[in-house]
Amino acid sequence: MQGRIIKGIAGFYYVYDVVEFAVYECKAKGIFRKEKIKPLVGDLVEYEVLDKEEGTGNITKILPRKSELIRPAVANIDQALVVFAVTKPKPHFNLLDRFLVMMERQEMSVVICFNKQDLAGEEETAELKATYESCGYRVIFTSAYKEENIQEIKAVLKGKITAVAGPSGVGKSSLINCLQENINMETGSISRKIERGKHTTRHSELIPVDEDSYIMDTPGFSSLYTNDFEKEELKSYFPEFREYEGTCRFLGCNHVSEPGCMVKNALEEGNIHRTRYDDYLEMYRELEQKEKRRY
């Protein structure tokens, strides 16, 4: 039988069988320990049922992974949905840009969702849309409270495993609840079996939103690591800089203080957004300081 690990805790792996709409509490066979392979949330696995009534089984095989993240340790994530509020609270652009850098480093596609659009004016939404769509990101505005554009989010999730991230207070939990609203009762009972409560999850967990779509809410995506690489790499994680690659006066220009920099020229002409560039500069300086401390 085949299923997907939707949660792992204390050596137990909860395997969701999409055919049966059932979850089995499984242990991994000893062969995995011997081969130093650890099952991960998101893994597609083969398993055998030990007790159908009790819902227990053993994982016998882990199918090949198409991707693997280290922080958090999850497999087969297709994309990330980052959720911020348009207002109340206003977007923390530096936090958003750090998240985007982290995803660019992992070569993962990102969809940006700005929630609470019902509380914002047209000017606010237009500015956010212009800033991030010009960088190549898809931007969707939603209202979990009024259930606006939820179907557009569902279309983005279709057939994928999506990591959902965002700071507290932006309506992320309400959005996830909206996405789960229309799933059938059998799938809905899954969350009860693995004791998913209203509290903040402390373990990576996949939540089925239909038979071939999952979302993952995890605390790991709140801890953003943007200082474990060289400062020269940073520019490649800002997509809007790429069209100017090779056009600056100096080869290897970092777009900071070098003369003849075409990125800074684009900034002055309004073709690159100031908030994005300022966040780039802040991250660059942090990496620079870390490098100095190292030596």
Name what the model sees in each region.
Residues 1-9:
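Structural detector for short beta-strands of small beta-barrel domains
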Residues 87-136:
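Phosphate-binding glycine-rich loops and their immediate beta-loop-alpha structural context
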Residues 13-18, 26, 47:
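SH3/SH3-like beta-barrel fold
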Residues 22-37:
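Beta-strand/loop nucleic-acid-binding surfaces
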Residues 172-188:
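A conserved segment at the C-terminal end of the G1
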Residues 118-170:
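Canonical P-loop GTPase G-domain recognition
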Residues 11, 35-53, 63-79, 102, ...:
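Helix-rich effector regions associated with P-loop NTPase G domains
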Residues 52-62, 90-92:
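Short, Lys/Arg- and Gly-enriched loop/turn segments at beta-strand edges
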